[in-house]
């Protein structure tokens, strides 16, 4: 039979094998084809490293299966593993080792079975099938080992044939783990399994607890039939595309396949079948789409149009829509803006009530048309109840209803017994005997429903004095509840308590399970000193808001206070201090924000924009970003999509390498711009740096290192500050922002180091408007360097600058001393208008 072997570079090799071949035989065939010695090959299948002495059939590897080939880098490295008892274990590993391999090494040393081990790094639980390099674990990193207490829980998996399988799992198991357990029991490859719970298809990377799957829950197993079927997609130009699909594929999957074939981003695709627009989350079988069915592809034109919606109060809302949007879509947009549930909205145009399933173009609604919004009034009022799985329930209630009554209504709708319900509003747990009006719950308020897990557990709270308190809690308890229990035991008011777990401050409205706090976990209690402080928040409209805060408040807490005062949702807020965007998880003291400091509030406009990232393999990734995102944020989004660690990414735009701390708008990157992604190759090379005294320094570098990085390495070795270093190669002065590969500097190349004498000089640059700029320069600076300094001061790109001195236009590669430009000389700056000069 044939199998495929995929390398990390994306290359796929085809091998002729037999099911009885050993892994050793397969590696020999790879050596014959690719020249890679077997001892440098590691083969992975279904997230598991394959052992030499086993056969393909031992691993249920069938025809057209794909193995993954990872190369062992010679040499390896040491890492440390710290247990909860404080013991530290040293392991010899390679960056390409999987977490599973690491657990096996721990078992060899400590005798702990892998299925009882949980490894934590940088606060994240590590998954068996991933490698150390996937998590950027480097030499001498420390992992933390937490033991899984035996027991977990049992769940059931029911197949379409009616057979029920029992599995031993833990709430923290991923769906991928569950599929692997099903494979172990039933031999069904994970890629042929679809798991359904509460009517929802479960995603591989999520955990059982993400879906609120509890002990003795039943999942449904649907098999993906191999081979699937063909369908056709017809475009408006008449072109027909053939796709290989399965009836269980979602519309989202189909759009991704169309993107692979045609390069059309999914958000620009609308698929129509039997006159109906298909929704992303539904499957082909939901729409009864069978083999050789034809779908119609309509492109969403970017930009669409604006329409207005006028309410009975006279308020006018502006919406971005497309003529192909359904009335249902429009109501959803109104809900996003105004919070009015679609079932309370009636839309009127030209005296006619609009029906949900029709489109704007069906009613001839064009740009800048005005719709009228009429609310359906109910008796009493409506409130919403949001569950942990994200489902929202609508209830008809009255302000005088007790919490007990509300729980009974939830039982009627959802079948959840009242004694398993906990209702939370404004971060507070609601008591049965109180009424909605006691808690100031008004129409369209949203309550949060948390289920009580039967049984509870004990946790410990350690104070700074060393005292340890034991608390009886449930995983669904909020941090606020925990603080109340501490107050009951110790008399410390909740507003003076700060609880820390895994180095993170815990927020009142979150639950213990949100932070993965399990039985016998230890929290740390730190007391807040009374008093706090005031800070100011200035908006773009010039309004200043005063907030009462503490230095230990997180940015997330501050945004919540702004929401309380101004009604602006936190996800639309960006806070700036000292020119820096503040991150949610950090505290005010992390940024040295003191009393009476002023923060600046910038609103994120909903929707942001799309940009494209093109890799060297030609693959194009689509990202949702905002102009205010930093390059660091963008690299994190690429990591989320592609798994490439940020420190291996170099992003290029307009020929320039982008710096982590700058934003997209700093580089004038706009919607639908394309960035280029270049990978930093690990391993690097040696170069030499020769000083004027004749001394030669050896440096370990990578071709992707910037000149700035190289100067930092020289500073580490020789103590010379980067701003006093000038590096020369092939007679050319090297610029900080460029890379070694930009200058074709290869292994064992020699750079020359010239020192800048301190002091330099000042020159003046006069613009046509009469403005004079002062620059700090040196006689050895090139004209290119000078233009870069002008860009830093004035924001004018170098390619739009022409510099004149003594009636002569200055050339980029020459230095100031070449033109005899001395201290306090005046240059003249003329701007090049695109397409010609002025």
Curated annotation (Swiss-Prot):
It holds the Pfam family ubiquitin. Residues 1-76, 77-152, 153-228, 229-304, 305-380, 381-456, 457-532, 533-608, 609-684, 685-760, 761-836 form the Ubiquitin-like domain. The keyword Ubl conjugation applies. There is a cross-link at residue 76 (Glycyl lysine isopeptide (Gly-Lys) (interchain with K-? in acceptor proteins)). GO terms for molecular function: protein tag activity; ubiquitin protein ligase binding. Gene3D superfamilies: Phosphatidylinositol 3-kinase Catalytic Subunit, Chain A, domain 1. One of its GO terms (biological process) is ubiquitin-dependent protein catabolic process. GO terms for cellular component: cytoplasm; nucleus. Residues 837-838 form a propeptide. It comes from the Eukaryota. Keywords: Cytoplasm, Isopeptide bond, Nucleus, Repeat, Ubl conjugation. There is a cross-link at residue 48 (Glycyl lysine isopeptide (Lys-Gly) (interchain with G-Cter in ubiquitin)). InterPro entries: Ubiquitin-like_dom, Ubiquitin-like_domsf, Ubiquitin_CS, Ubiquitin_dom, Ubiquitin_ubiquitin-like. The keyword Nucleus applies. Belongs to the ubiquitin family. In C.elegans ubiquitin is encoded by 2 different genes. ubq-2 gene codes for a single copy of ubiquitin fused to the ribosomal proteins eL40. ubq-1 gene codes for a polyubiquitin precursor with exact head to tail repeats. For the sake of clarity sequence features are annotated only for the first chain, and are not repeated for each of the following chains. Ubiquitin exists either covalently attached to another protein, or free (unanchored). When covalently bound, it is conjugated to target proteins via an isopeptide bond either as a monomer (monoubiquitin), a polymer linked via different Lys residues of the ubiquitin (polyubiquitin chains) or a linear polymer linked via the initiator Met of the ubiquitin (linear polyubiquitin chains). Polyubiquitin chains, when attached to a target protein, have different functions depending on the Lys residue of the ubiquitin that is linked: Lys-48-linked is involved in protein degradation via the proteasome. This is Polyubiquitin-A. The lineage of its organism: Eukaryota, Metazoa, Ecdysozoa, Nematoda, Chromadorea. The gene is ubq-1.
């Amino acid at each position: 039979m044939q199998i495929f072997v995929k390398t990390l570079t994306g290359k796929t090799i085809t091998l002729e094998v037999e099911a009885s071949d050993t892994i050793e035989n397969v590696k020999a065939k790879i050596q014959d084809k690719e020249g890679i010695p077997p001892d440098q090959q590691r083969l992975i299948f279904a997230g598991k490293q394959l052992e030499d002495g086993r056969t393909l059939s031992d691993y249920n590897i069938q025809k057209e299966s794909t193995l993954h080939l990872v190369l062992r880098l010679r040499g390896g490295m040491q890492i440390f593993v710290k247990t909860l008892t404080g013991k530290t274990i040293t392991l010899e590993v390679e960056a390409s080792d999987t977490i599973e391999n690491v657990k096996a090494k721990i078992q060899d040393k400590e005798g702990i079975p892998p299925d009882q081990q949980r490894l934590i790094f940088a606060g994240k639980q590590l998954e068996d099938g991933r490698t150390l390099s996937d998590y950027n674990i480097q030499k001498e990193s420390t992992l933390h080992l937490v033991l899984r207490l035996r027991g977990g829980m049992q769940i059931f998996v029911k197949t379409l044939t009616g057979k029920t399988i029992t599995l031993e799992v833990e709430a923290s198991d991923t769906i991928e783990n569950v599929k692997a357990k099903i494979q172990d029991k039933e031999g069904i490859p994970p890629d042929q399994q679809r798991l359904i719970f509460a009517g929802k298809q479960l995603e591989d990377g999520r955990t059982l607890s993400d879906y609120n799957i509890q002990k003795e829950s039943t999942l449904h197993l649907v098999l993906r039939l191999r081979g699937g079927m063909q369908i056709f997609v017809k475009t408006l130009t008449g072109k027909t595309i053939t796709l290989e699909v399965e009836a269980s594929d979602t519309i989202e999957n189909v759009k991704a396949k169309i993107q692979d074939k045609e390069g059309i981003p999914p958000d620009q695709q609308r698929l129509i079948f039997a006159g109906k627009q298909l929704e992303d989350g539904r499957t082909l079988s939901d729409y009864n789409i069978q083999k050789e069915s034809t779908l119609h592809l309509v492109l969403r034109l970017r930009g669409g149009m604006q329409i207005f919606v006028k309410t009975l109060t006279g308020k006018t809302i502006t919406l971005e829509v497309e003529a192909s949007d359904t009335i249902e879509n429009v109501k959803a947009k109104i809900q996003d803006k105004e919070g009015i549930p679609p079932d309370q909205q009636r839309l009127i145009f030209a005296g006619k009530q609009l029906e949900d399933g029709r489109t704007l173009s069906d009613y001839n609604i064009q740009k800048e048309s005005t719709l009228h919004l009429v609310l359906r009034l109910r008796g009493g009022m409506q409130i919403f109840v949001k569950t942990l799985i994200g489902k929202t329930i609508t209830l008809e209630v009255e302000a005088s209803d007790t919490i007990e009554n509300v729980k009974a209504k939830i039982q009627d709708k959802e079948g959840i017994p009242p004694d398993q319900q906990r209702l939370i509003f404004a971060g507070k747990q609601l008591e049965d005997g109180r009424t909605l009006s006691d808690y100031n719950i008004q129409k369209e308020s949203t309550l949060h429903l948390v289920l009580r897990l039967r049984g509870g557990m004990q946790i410990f709270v350690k104070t700074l004095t060393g005292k340890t308190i034991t608390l009886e809690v449930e995983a669904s308890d909020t941090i606020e509840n925990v603080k109340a229990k501490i107050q009951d035991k110790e008399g410390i008011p909740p507003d003076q308590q700060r609880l820390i777990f895994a180095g993170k401050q815990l927020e009142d409205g979150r639950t213990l399970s949100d932070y993965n706090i399990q039985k016998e976990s230890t929290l740390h209690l730190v007391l807040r000193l009374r008093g706090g402080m005031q800070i100011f928040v200035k908006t773009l409209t010039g309004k200043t808001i005063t907030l009462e805060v503490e230095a230990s408040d997180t940015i997330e807490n501050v945004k919540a206070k702004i929401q309380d005062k101004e009604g602006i949702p936190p996800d639309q807020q960006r806070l700036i201090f000292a020119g820096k965007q503040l991150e949610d998880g950090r505290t005010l003291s992390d940024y040295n924000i003191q009393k009476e400091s002023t923060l600046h509030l910038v609103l994120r406009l909903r929707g942001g924009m799309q940009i494209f990232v093109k890799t060297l393999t030609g693959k194009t990734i689509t990202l949702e970003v905002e102009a205010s995102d930093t390059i660091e944020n963008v690299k994190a989004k690429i990591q989320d999509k592609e798994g490439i660690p940020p420190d291996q990414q170099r992003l290029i735009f307009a020929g320039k390498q982008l710096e982590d701390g700058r934003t997209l708008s700093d580089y004038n990157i706009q919607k639908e711009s394309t960035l280029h992604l270049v990978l930093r190759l690990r391993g690097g090379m040696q170069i030499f740096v020769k000083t004027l005294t004749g001394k030669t320094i050896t440096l370990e570098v990578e071709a992707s290192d910037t000149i700035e990085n190289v100067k930092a390495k020289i500073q580490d070795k020789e103590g010379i500050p980067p701003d006093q270093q000038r590096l020369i190669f092939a007679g050319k002065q090297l610029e900080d922002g460029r890379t070694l590969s930009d200058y074709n500097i290869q292994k064992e190349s020699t750079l020359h180091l010239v020192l800048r004498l301190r002091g330099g000089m000042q020159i003046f640059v006069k613009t046509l408007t009469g403005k004079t700029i002062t620059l700090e320069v040196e006689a050895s600076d090139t004209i290119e360097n000078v233009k870069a300094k002008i860009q830093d001061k004035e924001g004018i790109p170098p390619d739009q600058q022409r510099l004149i001195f003594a009636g002569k236009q200055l050339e980029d590669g020459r230095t100031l001393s070449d033109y005899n430009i001395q201290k306090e000389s005046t240059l003249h700056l003329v701007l090049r208008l695109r397409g010609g000069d002025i």
